[in-house]
Amino acid sequence: MAFMGRELKWGVAHIYSSLNNTIIHITDLTGAETVSRWSGGMVVKADREKPSPYAAMIAASRAAAEAMDKGITALHIKVRAPGGHGPKTPGPGAQAAIRALARAGFIIGRIEDVTPIPHDTTRRPGGRRGRRV
């Protein structure tokens, strides 16, 4: 498939964004071959800055540069929050990571939320009488 005169090579950007960190993992279309992987904790010194939008933006731009070097020109984006018992909404770094990938020059295909949501709910930790503080 060509877009504006150039041939497209598609990849998938898996963005996992929690309240503690943001992980950007770029793979080929099958998801089997890792092209690039960066996290907020790899680009900042202080632990408290790992979930920040700034850390996500820097991690995404470094992952994008690595993927561009390997020939990826277009991306589908899959955003994931912790889900399950944890929060169902992505952390503060998700939006910044998506914007950084778009600004890096990739053609963006689909943006999809792949947060695991239980349909019947598994048992929460803490037992029958709850967590006693």
Curated annotation (Swiss-Prot):
* A GO MF term: structural constituent of ribosome
* GO annotations of cellular component type: ribonucleoprotein complex; ribosome
The UniProt keywords, alphabetically, are: Ribonucleoprotein, Ribosomal protein, RNA-binding, rRNA-binding
Extract the InterPro entries matched here.
Answer: Ribosomal_uS11, Ribosomal_uS11_archaeal, Ribosomal_uS11_CS, Ribosomal_uS11_sf
Output the GO biological process annotations, alphabetical, semicolon-separated: translation
Q: What does this protein do?
A: Located on the platform of the 30S subunit.
NCBIfam families linked? arch_S11P, PRK09607.1
On subunit structure and binding partners, the annotation says: Part of the 30S ribosomal subunit.
- HAMAP family (alphabetical): Ribosomal_uS11
Family indicated by similarity: Belongs to the universal ribosomal protein uS11 family.
Q: Which PANTHER family match?
A: 40S RIBOSOMAL PROTEIN S14/30S RIBOSOMAL PROTEIN S11 (PTHR11759)
Protein name listed in UniProt: Small ribosomal subunit protein uS11
Species name: Staphylothermus marinus (strain ATCC 43588 / DSM 3639 / JCM 9404 / F1)
